[in-house]
Amino acid sequence: MKILISNDDGYLAPGLIALADALAPIADIVVVAPDSNRSGSSNSLTLDRPLSVYQASNGFYFINGTPSDCVHIALTGIMSFRPDLIVSGINQGQNMGDDTLYSGTVAAATEGHLFGIPAIAFSQLEKGWAELKSAARVARDIVERRFETLPENFLLNVNIPNLPYEQLKPAVATRLGRRHQSEAVIKAQDPHGRDIYWIGPSGGQKDAGEGTDFHATAQGHVSITPLQIDLTQNAQLAALKKVLA
């Protein structure tokens, strides 16, 4: 198996290194990741300047761009072969519910999915890298399952509780939950007395009932959510056609 690995925390992130170490024994891996933390960059591509590719002493490639840039350049400019799978992570912090729209971790996987390649995004619930070896072991378990019964070009979002491997409950299929709207921005002043703003924290859980990613991970399960690119609101499509008729 040939696997492309990326992330949004940067090429030096412990989660990326742990994921690469876990998958190297079972696959030929290529790692292409941002040069720095690009959390929250979503699916953005850098179009206003050229990008540069560097290679670290451990063989990892790193790019002064977004996670989507990294996967795009890896597939169209660096790799001499087409990978069988793209994995992203392991992210420091959850990517559940509305988080998936902003997540650079999910975006890296999505970019590969857009190229017709199966992709999986891996995230830990809590920041701080606690139980990272456990999360990496879960990632390897999931990659080895192959998911032959899924459509050929699947896109999965995996969230892993920060628990010892032996304490984790079995992985379950989930849907995305929902959050309340984000908290207000945090206003401050720079050294020159000018107003500056920090984006506020994410909103709390709004839809976290049974069957959601929020609920599953709260019970100690690994959550696996199948994602899709089509954002069409099909329930409103027929009504809109009537309005426009």
Curated annotation (Swiss-Prot):
Domain of life (superkingdom): Bacteria
Pfam family, one: SurE
EC number annotated for this UniProt entry: 3.1.3.5
Cofactors named for this entry: a divalent metal cation
Record bears the keyword Nucleotide-binding: yes
Gene3D superfamilies assigned to the protein according to its UniProt record, in alphabetical order: Survival protein SurE-like phosphatase/nucleotidase
Annotated positions binding a divalent metal cation: 8-9, 39, 91
Enzyme class, first EC level, given as a word: hydrolase
GO cellular component: cytoplasm
Catalytic activity as recorded in UniProt: a ribonucleoside 5'-phosphate + H2O = a ribonucleoside + phosphate
Annotated GO MF terms: 3'-nucleotidase activity; 5'-nucleotidase activity; exopolyphosphatase activity; metal ion binding; nucleotide binding
Keywords, sorted A to Z: Cytoplasm, Hydrolase, Metal-binding, Nucleotide-binding
Cofactor, how bound (note): Binds 1 divalent metal cation per subunit.
Family to which this protein belongs: Belongs to the SurE nucleotidase family.
Role this protein plays: Nucleotidase that shows phosphatase activity on nucleoside 5'-monophosphates.
Protein name, per record: 5'-nucleotidase SurE
Taxonomic source organism: Herminiimonas arsenicoxydans
